[in-house]
Curated annotation (Swiss-Prot):
Main localization of the protein described in the UniProt heading: cytoplasm
InterPro entries, alphabetized: rRNA_ssu_MeTfrase_G, SAM-dependent_MTases_sf
Family per similarity comment: Belongs to the methyltransferase superfamily. RNA methyltransferase RsmG family.
Pfam families xref list: GidB
GO CC terms in record: cytosol
Source organism (scientific name): Ruthia magnifica subsp. Calyptogena magnifica
Enzyme class of the recorded protein, top EC level: transferase
UniProt-listed NCBIfam families: rsmG_gidB (TIGR00138)
Keyword Transferase: yes
Name the record gives this protein: Ribosomal RNA small subunit methyltransferase G
Keyword Cell wall biogenesis/degradation: no
Gene name in the database record: rsmG
Swiss-Prot/TrEMBL catalytic activity: guanosine(527) in 16S rRNA + S-adenosyl-L-methionine = N(7)-methylguanosine(527) in 16S rRNA + S-adenosyl-L-homocysteine
Domain of life, per lineage: Bacteria
Amino acid sequence: MNSEVLLIEGASLMNIKLESEQISKLMNYLKLIIKWNKSYNLSAIRTMEKGVYKHLLDSLSVIAYIKDKSLLDVGSGAGLPGIVISIMRPELLVTVLDTVGKKCRFMQFAKTQLQLKNLNVIKNRVENYQIEFCFEQIISRAFSKVEKILKLTQHLLCNNGEYLLMKGAGFQQETLPYGVDIQSLCVPEILGKRYLLIFRREK
């Protein structure tokens, strides 16, 4: 079974119907990751098949929780999940942020190659990143512990904004904020449980 079929069928199992343009861009994005990996070491994933599950489908698992205006992906690395979200939601302003130059160069290249006009690539430390507006949602897939993420990014989130923190089962050992909403994520072929921690900032 080829990688494109794995993507389509995996997304279908998550109740996500992909359009042809989305499939094309997602597959081309994954090919870029695999190609650049040879020189840039962007990810431990080296094959298209594993990339479909570990990168694309894992990132797609949060799509139902994404709102309409602005999203910041902190510690985005190769652009996960931010670039996947940008492909799926072209009307949404997506900012991907990382401190590592080679990863930001890759994300900028992917933006150009995939013509993602709604994507903004930032090389900076999140605690030093300053903006004139605020983000409706802040997402993180593999950046840091919950307590540290909240501390470093609080100046960037709108009142009534949301944190979306993607975690494995180990999050249970962390200090969690009061009122956190814990959602199980269904990702085909992923060993180990995946969770989305949702924390809403009140006025």
